[in-house]
């Protein structure tokens, strides 16, 4: 199971929000590129970036910070936030982002997601952020009447690389990941699912790994890495598969 350390970008800095509230942002590193390099040095194989300002603005805002991160690391990077048209998708993939995550546009314009999957196979993820089971968009500011599973099923045959599923009520709250909801989503899909929101201890990683057969491919970890609740080496060892043990 992959661990995706998260770098959420707000005003050019690496921050963590509480339940998606931009007014409750804690700055963990004013230099996101240095943070990205540190995660790479710790042994992580992926990075998960979110342009928080972009998610609210509907367009890239922290492009300079993302570019500096890409200059510092060699591991693959996935990026979400403010990516809502084909031109922006093409721009980011051309600049070195391995995968883009489409959230709001997946609800508003599902055909764009399908077109992007055809144009860029294996490089398009769908981000489904749920509040009480319903999809939230526009930087989590608006909650729709669409259920998370119903949205995910729309893309079953589209060639989406992964579904990034976030439980908003758990995000940044350090109350534990919603394993049950994530596994329930994954078991109904053929698309791999990446869990997000609320990871606070190694026990969360073990609980998710125990549900790997449902289709949970990875987990995004944020605040717990920044405040030391999760030790990177222990986390990587716990989630390693047989192929990692042979390395």
From Swiss-Prot:
The EC number(s) attached to this protein equal: 5.3.1.16
Gene, per the UniProt record: hisA
On whether Membrane is a keyword of this UniProt record, the answer is: no
Q: Which GO terms describe its biological process?
A: L-histidine biosynthetic process; L-tryptophan biosynthetic process
Q: Name one GO cellular component term.
A: cytoplasm
Q: Name one Pfam family in it.
A: His_biosynth
Q: Which SUPFAM superfamilies match?
A: Ribulose-phoshate binding barrel (SSF51366)
In which pathway does this enzyme or protein participate? Amino-acid biosynthesis; L-histidine biosynthesis; L-histidine from 5-phospho-alpha-D-ribose 1-diphosphate: step 4/9
What this protein is called in its record is: 1-(5-phosphoribosyl)-5-[(5-phosphoribosylamino)methylideneamino] imidazole-4-carboxamide isomerase
Q: Which CDD domains match?
A: HisA
| InterPro entries documented for this protein | Aldolase_TIM, His_biosynth, HisA_bact_arch, Isoase_HisA-like, Isoase_HisA-like_bact, RibuloseP-bd_barrel
Q: Which family does it belong to?
A: Belongs to the HisA/HisF family.
Species for this entry:
Rhodospirillum centenum (strain ATCC 51521 / SW)
Q: Which reaction does it catalyse?
A: 1-(5-phospho-beta-D-ribosyl)-5-[(5-phospho-beta-D-ribosylamino)methylideneamino]imidazole-4-carboxamide = 5-[(5-phospho-1-deoxy-D-ribulos-1-ylimino)methylamino]-1-(5-phospho-beta-D-ribosyl)imidazole-4-carboxamide
Q: What class of enzyme is it?
A: isomerase
Keywords for this protein: Amino-acid biosynthesis, Cytoplasm, Histidine biosynthesis, Isomerase
**Subcellular location field:** Cytoplasm
Q: Which residues form the active site?
A: 8 (proton acceptor), 129 (proton donor)
* GO MF terms, alphabetically ordered: 1-(5-phosphoribosyl)-5-[(5-phosphoribosylamino)methylideneamino]imidazole-4-carboxamide isomerase activity
